[in-house]
């Protein structure tokens, strides 16, 4: 039986976290943003699929950075 590939475990894929509605609302309020102002990630993206993200959800992406130590970005899941 073939092994299933888990995109979230790949060494080149940064950590992705699906935020709850409450977490997303707190984040947007703290940053003074509307959901529509966030960059997009499509619901068909392999990581969004792995997280079972739905359009309207917000994903936090945590990347390791040689200069900043850690870089955090947010994406709005869009139908795609």
From Swiss-Prot:
Domain of life, per UniProt, equals Archaea
Which keywords does the record carry?
Answer: Cytoplasm, DNA-directed RNA polymerase, Nucleotidyltransferase, Transcription, Transferase
Q: Check the record and name the InterPro entries matching this protein.
A: Arch_Rpo5/euc_Rpb5, RNA_pol_subH/Rpb5_C, RNA_pol_subH/Rpb5_CS, RPB5-like_sf
Q: Does the keyword Signal apply?
A: no
Compartment(s): Cytoplasm
Reaction catalyzed: RNA(n) + a ribonucleoside 5'-triphosphate = RNA(n+1) + diphosphate
Q: What Gene Ontology terms for biological process does this UniProt record contain?
A: transcription by RNA polymerase II; transcription elongation by RNA polymerase I; tRNA transcription by RNA polymerase III
Q: What is its main location?
A: cytoplasm
Task: Name the EC number(s).
Answer: 2.7.7.6
Please provide one cellular component term from the Gene Ontology annotations of this protein.
DNA-directed RNA polymerase complex
Name any one GO molecular function.
DNA binding
Q: What does this protein do?
A: DNA-dependent RNA polymerase (RNAP) catalyzes the transcription of DNA into RNA using the four ribonucleoside triphosphates as substrates.
Q: Which family does it belong to?
A: Belongs to the archaeal Rpo5/eukaryotic RPB5 RNA polymerase subunit family.
Quaternary structure and partners:
Part of the RNA polymerase complex.
> What's this protein's name?
DNA-directed RNA polymerase subunit Rpo5
Q: Which organism is it from?
A: Thermofilum pendens (strain DSM 2475 / Hrk 5)
């Amino acid at each position: 039986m073939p092994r299933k590939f888990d995109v979230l475990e790949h060494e080149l894929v940064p950590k992705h976290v699906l935020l709850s509605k409450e977490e997303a609302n707190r984040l947007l309020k703290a940053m003074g943003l509307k959901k529509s102002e966030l960059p997009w990630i499509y619901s068909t993206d392999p990581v969004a699929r792995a997280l079972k993200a739905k359009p309207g959800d917000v994903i936090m992406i945590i990347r390791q950075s040689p200069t900043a130590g850690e870089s955090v970005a947010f994406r709005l899941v869009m139908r795609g």
